[in-house]
A protein has these predicted regions:
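A short beta-strand-loop-beta hairpin characteristic of the jelly-roll/cupin
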Residues: 54-83, 93
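Ligand-binding loop in jelly-roll beta-barrel domains
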Residues: 69, 83, 91-117
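Conserved short histidine dyad/triad with adjacent acidic residue
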Residues: 24, 39-55
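A structure-centric signal for secondary-structure junctions around beta-strands
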Residues: 35-37, 57, 104-105
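Short histidine-centered beta-strand/loop micro-motifs
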Residues: 28-30, 49-55, 72, 79-80, ...
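A short, N-terminal "cap"/entry segment at the start of jelly-roll beta-barrel domains
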Residues: 1-35, 50, 118-136
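Short, charged/polar surface micro-motifs in flexible loops or helix N-caps
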Residues: 34-36, 44-48, 67-69, 113-116
Length: 136
């Protein structure tokens, strides 16, 4: 296991830097995140999370690896997602995540309270914000 590297205004690391084995990998504190909650979760095959909901926190899930099934509400609504899959869930919606694949599933969950900042990104003075080949 390595370690998260921090600098002035940034932090970088890997999932392995945040822990080993199945379960929650807390991202917020090690990377110094203050604006929202974020965790990475590793679920072994055939394992499901507990059902839960939140009072205020909307959540966005991004499936990085494996195949998961999201179970919503009373269990009648089920949706399978593989790598690159995204799900957004209202705070009060009961949800459960199940690993229905043959390998470990890894997903990232980001949560926050209502309120949109809007587009506030800016380009440093004298630079262009465009995709271009990497300069060697």
């Amino acid at each position: 296991m390595g370690e998260v590297v921090t600098g002035e205004g940034y932090a970088v690391g890997t999932l392995d830097d945040l822990g080993e084995g199945p379960g929650f990998r807390k991202v917020r504190a090690p990377l110094g995140v203050t604006a929202f909650g974020v965790n990475a979760v590793v679920i072994p095959p055939g394992i499901e999370s507990g059902r839960h909901f939140h009072d205020e926190q909307e959540e966005l899930y991004f499936v990085h690896q494996g195949e998961v099934e999201f179970v919503f509400g009373d269990g009648e609504q089920r949706h399978r997602l593989g790598p690159g899959g995204i799900a957004r869930v209202d705070p009060r919606t009961v949800r459960q995540i199940r690993n229905v694949g043959d390998d470990d599933a890894i997903y990232v969950c980001v949560g926050g309270k209502d309120g949109y900042v809007g587009r506030d990104g800016r380009v440093p003075e004298g630079e262009e914000n465009r995709a271009r080949p990497i300069a060697s």
